[in-house]
Amino acid sequence: MSSSSSTSPRFGSMISAKLASPPPSLLLPPSPRLQGRRLTPPSCTPGTPAALPSPGPDKEPEREAAGSGSGSATTPRSPAQLGSSQLHRWSRARAHRSGRRLEWPTIRDRGSGGASSPPTPTRPHPSSDEAASAAAKVAVEEEDGYGVVGRDEAAKSIYMVSDGTGWTAEHSVNAALGQFEHCLVDRGCAVNTHLFNGIDDMDRLIEIVKQAAKEGALVLYTLADPSMAEATKKACELWGVPSNDILRPTIEAIASHIGVAPSGIPRSSPSRKGQLTEDYFRRIEAIDFTIKQDDGAQPQNLNRAHIVLVGVSRTGKTPLSIYLAQKGYKVANVPIVMGVNLPKSLFEIDQDKIFGLTINPVVLQAIRKARAKTLGFHGQKSNYAEMEHVRGELDHANQIFAQHPIWPVIEVTGKAIEETAAVVVRIFHDRKQKCAMPRISKRVAPIRIYDYLSEMVNTHVEYQKIFARDF
């Protein structure tokens, strides 16, 4: 492999020429597709008071009573501040992924009162149902589109540059930002991310670097072409832009390990078009199969599925199925409905491929209410989103799971689709003993033990959790 010192001098001269005589319209605006994406509460904006969610009619007397005692208005706490740490994490993570806001005060807002400020009245610690309902309400409001904010001028910008789709750069940056979740939300560190994909010529590359210099952005790039990657590095150095090559260290490490030089051909290169691999066609076939098997359709084909998901309505069976299908797994999902028997073919197939999904009833009720509102029958008489019906369906599902202890049951409350999919894939491969990926720790004949735990709330069995632990 060639080192950075042996890069062709023509790229250095091209960069110098571009920087010496820039065209009049050289600055490139941020990508409109990702413009305005932010990972911070709106209270971080200087001089902008934090917006508060509209209170319900049952909350107004409580706020008036709290404010009349001290003679001054007090800022009510957001529902997102209530509940357990797991539910807090769920709400924050959803805000991060969607680029929407959470009504959380920053350190400046919390500490601006000073010594003379009257103490804020404290509210009693909510019950588990109230906490779950509050966090679920925040997540549902975000999903419905409330609280979408524009671009934060005070935010730090991160530019992601790729010569392909940008999938690697985007997911790498999102994974890294997860390590700063405590700052992005709790401490008000504003971050904007902008994706520039399909960058395959020097002109566009220089435009992006100059725009990054103007905004003081960090440039992270995944460029397969070594000359483009080196040119990006030099351009960032000339313009004083902090940068990092995400892809190159990994490529060099693999090349050194296997003793083969990389091709250096970007995915978007015409020379690579038309080279569709067997894995590609297998993924397309899996997606086609999964779509046809959605929501219990064509139960006669369950034996052809790699994975079968069962659970009550709105436990995320369909999005999880599609996500797994994009990884090449043929997935079928079967709904559990009270009064409707499960298809006979479900019990005739290999039971090792069946996975159950369960969820907290309070969160499920909030999701169903949002679903009913979307479908337009929110005000109509229906037990679809009533708590008694929700509890009954989950109890019915738990009875089915108890009758089939070989089915792993995964708790999906507050989990992203990627997290649930990772659990499913890990159990699937461990059972089939087909995992081709090397394990971090060497294990011999993995033994899987399932612990059944039930949580009692108001004398009702809310849900059963099954934890898979490796020994």
UniProtKB/Swiss-Prot annotation:
Task: Establish whether keyword Cytoplasm is in the entry.
Answer: no
Which Pfam families does this entry report, sorted A to Z? Kinase-PPPase
The biased composition feature labelled Basic and acidic residues covers 100-111
Source taxon at top rank: Eukaryota
Annotated region Disordered: the residues are 1-133
Arranged from A to Z, the UniProt key words for this protein are: Chloroplast, Kinase, Nucleotide-binding, Plastid, Serine/threonine-protein kinase, Transferase, Transit peptide
Q: Where is the composition biased (Polar residues)?
A: 71-88
Give start-end positions of Pro residues composition bias. Answer: 21-32
The answer to whether the entry has keyword Methyltransferase is no
Its Enzyme Commission number(s) read 2.7.11.32, 2.7.4.27
What reaction gets catalysed by this protein?
N(tele)-phospho-L-histidyl/L-threonyl-[pyruvate, phosphate dikinase] + ADP = N(tele)-phospho-L-histidyl/O-phospho-L-threonyl-[pyruvate, phosphate dikinase] + AMP + H(+); N(tele)-phospho-L-histidyl/O-phospho-L-threonyl-[pyruvate, phosphate dikinase] + phosphate + H(+) = N(tele)-phospho-L-histidyl/L-threonyl-[pyruvate, phosphate dikinase] + diphosphate
Where's it found, cell-wise?
Plastid, Chloroplast
Q: What class of enzyme is it?
A: transferase
Explain the regulation of its activity: Regulated by light/dark exposure.
Give an example GO cellular component term for this record.
chloroplast
Comp. bias intervals (Basic residues)? 89-99
Presequence range in chain numbering: 1-49
Annotated family: Belongs to the pyruvate, phosphate/water dikinase regulatory protein family. PDRP subfamily.
- Sum up the protein's function in the record's words: Bifunctional serine/threonine kinase and phosphorylase involved in the dark/light-mediated regulation of PPDK by catalyzing its phosphorylation/dephosphorylation. Dark/light-induced changes in stromal concentrations of the competing ADP and Pi substrates govern the direction of the reaction. In the dark, phosphorylates the catalytic intermediate of PPDK (PPDK-HisP), inactivating it. Light exposure induces the phosphorolysis reaction that reactivates PPDK.
Q: What is this protein's record name?
A: Probable pyruvate, phosphate dikinase regulatory protein, chloroplastic
Look up and give the organism this protein is from: Oryza sativa subsp. japonica (Rice)
- Gene coding for it: PDRP1
